Regions:
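Beta-rich nucleic-acid/ligand-interaction surfaces
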Residues: 202-217
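Aromatic (phenylalanine/tyrosine) cluster motif
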Residues: 14-26
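Intrinsically disordered, low-complexity regulatory regions enriched in Ser/Pro/Gly/Thr
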Residues: 150-152, 174, 181-182, 194-196, ...
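Long, hydrophobic, amphipathic alpha-helical segments used as structural scaffolds
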Residues: 111, 143, 196-200, 204
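Mixed-charge, glycine-accented linear interaction segment located at domain edges/termini
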Residues: 185-199
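Broad gene-expression machinery/nucleic-acid interaction feature
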Residues: 154-156, 199, 209-211
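N-terminal accessory segment detector
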Residues: 2-12, 31-179, 221-230
Length: 230
């Protein structure tokens, strides 16, 4: 289909008759207005066609799920991407933890709003239970297997997963047997704790399956004891 406006514009550009020049100028003005109208119409169509109402959706909408195969593919690609840019297992785990921290920081506010109606926890144990139950269900569709406290250190807690989904589809070569890709999950947990006002260092270890070791700052435990003493 011929574009009428472009045809008229082309004709006016290449033909010149002195007698009719006022009319040609008039025609050019009309064509310019027509072009402007067509451009505006196209822009209106572009921005209204299939208009997304994402800003109007409530944050409390039902949670969506991703297939395990899609997760396995994406996570394995993440691991390979990181592996190609490091020279040791510790560097690889650090990169995975950094990626996990980005995820944890992004999901915290929405998760607190959906699961806790915006209420933030102030006690260490309640915060850890929130992670064990709510965060784990949001990430993996189930609660974490266990939450334990170290016998000899009141700053240290453990979240234990016998068969973590994060490692289910990762094949670790013998020369890198110390690699635990749950460092990504450790990063998620560390970011959630830190951004919630519970600064801690979280690391992943092979023990009883996979264990996330959470070591809180002294200030967190001191504050918790002060709250207990009120």
């Amino acid at each position: 289909m011929m574009d009428v406006s472009s045809s008229v514009t082309t004709a006016c550009s290449y033909l010149y008759f002195p007698i009719f020049s006022p009319y040609i100028i008039y025609i050019q003005v009309i064509v310019a207005k027509l072009n402007s109208h067509l451009v505006q119409q196209k822009m209106d169509t572009r921005f209204t066609r299939g208009k997304s109402n994402i800003l109007e959706r409530p944050l409390t909408r039902p949670k969506t799920e991703v297939s395990v195969s899609a997760f396995a593919l994406l996570f394995s690609e993440m691991v390979q991407y990181c592996q190609s840019r490091v020279y040791s297992v510790s560097e690889l785990q650090t990169r995975l933890a950094d990626m996990g921290q980005s995820v944890g920081a992004s999901m915290l506010d929405v998760l607190v709003l959906r699961e806790k109606n915006g209420k933030r926890e102030t006690k260490v144990l309640n915060m850890l239970l929130f992670i064990k139950v709510n965060v784990w269900k949001s990430l993996f569709g189930k609660e974490a297997d266990k939450l334990e406290q170290a016998n000899d250190d009141d700053k240290t807690y453990y979240i234990i997963e016998k068969e973590p989904l994060i490692n289910a589809y990762i094949s670790v070569p013998k020369e890198n047997s110390s690699l635990n890709c749950a460092a990504f999950t450790a990063g998620v947990v560390e970011a959630i704790l830190t951004h919630s006002g519970f600064p801690a260092k979280v690391t992943a270890h092979w023990h009883k399956g996979t264990t996330l070791m959470i070591k809180f700052n002294e200030s967190v435990i001191a504050r918790d004891k002060a709250l207990d003493g009120r």
